[in-house]
Regions:
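Generic structural signal for short, flexible, solvent-exposed coil/loop and linker residues
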Residues: 26, 31-35, 44, 54-56, ...
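Active-site-adjacent substructure of cysteine-protease-like catalytic cores
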Residues: 47-107
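Extracytoplasmic/secreted proteins, especially bacterial periplasmic and envelope-associated proteins
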Residues: 1, 32-39, 54, 82, ...
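Cysteine-nucleophile protease catalytic domains, especially the papain-like/related folds used
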Residues: 1-47, 138-148
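Noncatalytic regulatory segments and standalone regulatory/sensor domains
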Residues: 24, 60, 78, 90-151
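Sec/Tat-exported extracytoplasmic proteins
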Residues: 2-7, 38-41, 59, 63, ...
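Alpha-helix initiation/capping motif
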Residues: 29-32, 51, 70-72, 125
């Protein structure tokens, strides 16, 4: 999603990107992503201390943010190995999210609907997404941000 935003040649969906990442290792680790981005001529930063203001600042600059979330379990006690979504906007009380896997059931965990179309332009309330993103409270979010072309 972020690479399409930058109009990187040969990247039409996350499948194209994952083929490159898989050359360098498991997708759950940062290093293969950094190496894949480098191959594609893109730089990005990864932090584990993001808060809502950090995300909003990137969005206000016109840059999407890839947010790590826990997608299993109830919103009151999220769990799971993790999943990443792309935040492309926000409103007074929601994040605008893109997810090629589908639409999340934020209250109960899991998926409300699967498929790329199901995950387009979903408005997730701060109330229900933030506990899955900022699991340890504000300032504990894992995200990729500041995507730039370097070639």
């Amino acid at each position: 999603m972020c690479l399409r935003y930058l109009d990187i040649p040969g990247i039409n969906d996350d499948t194209d990107y994952l083929k490159i990442v898989n050359k360098y290792g498991d997708t759950i680790y940062r290093k293969p992503h950094f190496r894949a981005l480098e191959e594609l001529g893109v730089s990005a930063k990864f932090i584990q201390t993001a808060d809502s203001d950090d995300v909003k600042k990137q969005i206000d600059l016109g840059l999407p943010v890839v947010a790590g979330i826990l997608h299993h379990g109830a919103v009151s006690d999220p769990s799971g190995g993790g999943h990443f979504v792309v935040i492309t906007g926000y409103g007074r009380d929601y994040w605008l999210v893109q997810d090629p896997y589908g639409e999340l059931d934020l209250v109960n965990g899991g998926w409300a609907a699967t498929g790329a179309v199901a995950g387009r332009n979903i408005r997730y309330s701060f109330k229900n997404l933030n506990p899955r993103f900022f699991v340890g409270g504000e300032g504990s979010g894992w995200c990729w941000y500041d995507f730039k072309r370097v070639k």
